Amino acid sequence: MPKSYSRRQFLQASGALAVGAAGAGSAFAGSALAKDAKGDWNAGEVVHLLPAANHERILLKASFRSGLKDAPQLLVAGRRIKGHRSDTHGRFWQFDVPGLKADTGYTLQLADGKGKALCSPWPLKTFPCPDASPDHVRLLVYTCAGGHPDARGPGGMEAFRSLAIRHALLERGLAYQPDAVIANGDHVYQDQRTWLESSNPAIRKAATDFYQQTGMFDTSQPVLGTDNERILATLVDPQIAHLYGTRLRSTPVFFMMDDHDYFENDEAEENFVTFPPDHFDLSLGRTVQDMYYPEFLPDATRSLMLPGSNASDRAPQVSECFGTLRYGKLLEVLMYDCGRYLSLKDKHAGIIPPEAEKWLLDRTRQSEARHLIHMPSTPFGWSAGKWREWYPDVVVSDETDMAPAGAISQRFWGVQGKNLHLSTQKGKYMWQPGWFAQHQRIVTAMTGQKRPAVMMSGDLHATGWDRMLRSGDVDLSKNPLYLILNGTLGTGKAGWPSAARGLAPSTPTLLQLERNVQPVEKNGFSIVDITPDKIVCRLFVWREPDPFEAISSLEPYEVIEIPIG
């Protein structure tokens, strides 16, 4: 396939090949196995495919309907790449393909150890070289896609959207044929202590009932090779493998991790502090990543010494927590996990470790990309009064304002009273002043750029945007920081901030935002178009009482244009 083809042209031209192979190959004779959403591609034995790509390498994560005794193969560019098993039973495999040409379309094919096709072939295209000058790239971005569809909140309330709703939202986003997908954290919701030890009896009962059906992890045993592995697949398959299936097989993905991906909510109480994650939670998070979705591929400007990078039990040189999406000289996206390496060192604390902060600051000041986007898993610009935020604000009511001063713990369903609002008049239990100090160093570097300062965040169950004009004593008015919440795919009724905490996401006390408009608590996603002269971000939202059928023709409710000059 010639390099001059765009990714969209390549996918269109490759479609006929995939359809023909599915119909003609004896491997699928009489098959009633799953096809993709449009019914024109035969998934065969494959349950899910999630590929990462840069300009020279592909890393593919895959799962199959049943365990494979012999290692499967990935056929690409005349090569046979032997799969590396990610689990005990041979259902999960990964394929690492280095040495590819930049900006080139490839046809991929999975086969078993004897060479028999396991699914139809499909196309995938590498990114342009870092020194290339592409004129356009399109991203599909969202957060909080996880959640077991059978889980329930207090009183049987819907906790997460059905897979049908999430599938419809994904299909609508993919209809725009993005060049890459960024899923910003919270791919899994299966909290342990924070559900089972909640101060709310209804949450404890809902969690207990659910875990009685699935089983509880034995924290004294390894994750793999014990019954923990069965429980893990039971809990996670619906949230990742069944959610994505093979929809993204031809679209490079970037999956960031956040708090729930370590099987806890970010909470601090007198009887427990959930982050940084303990050893077992960390093992759960790393195992899910290893089995289900790709790590970040290496980038020449990102040190292999960053925490969570170049581990001996991972593909060479990948990073588990800090990633780069580089699309020629047009775009650089810096993605960072704000959970795994959080520290509790008072004024010296950080939500990300010092090495990662240095990387962010260096790239912000030195990147030659036309556009630079920061993408943390914990948002700048708004607060829900949660513990692990950059800001010290807590949710209080008129009644708590009259209570004696002291530290307040902010838990799900934990704030009662009238006229709820954010306040810094009372301390937030275990909140670290070093977190905001780190925030200030990042916003200072971002506003100091000659290009627009842009940040797109995850975690917060809402959609919206604003511009930061001031942060504490940092004046950003000469180059305001664009803040965008890209939308939440899976949040159900129990998860909206106004339901869980009594207050919609609001502006922290220490910030001055230009619009000061509360984000919208609806499901959705963003389509982001980047050209040399501007970034255009289209925000899509949906929620009842709008009919389900409206998702298939959803149009943006807001369009943000960020010009380069």
Summary of predicted features, one role per range:
Residues 2-3, 9-31, 103:
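N-terminal export signals
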Residues 4-5, 58:
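Short alpha-helical segments used as structural interaction elements across diverse proteins
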Residues 7-8, 439:
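Short, cationic motifs built from Arg/Lys/His that form the positively charged side of catalytic pockets
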Residues 35-565:
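Metal-dependent phosphoester/phosphodiester hydrolase catalytic core
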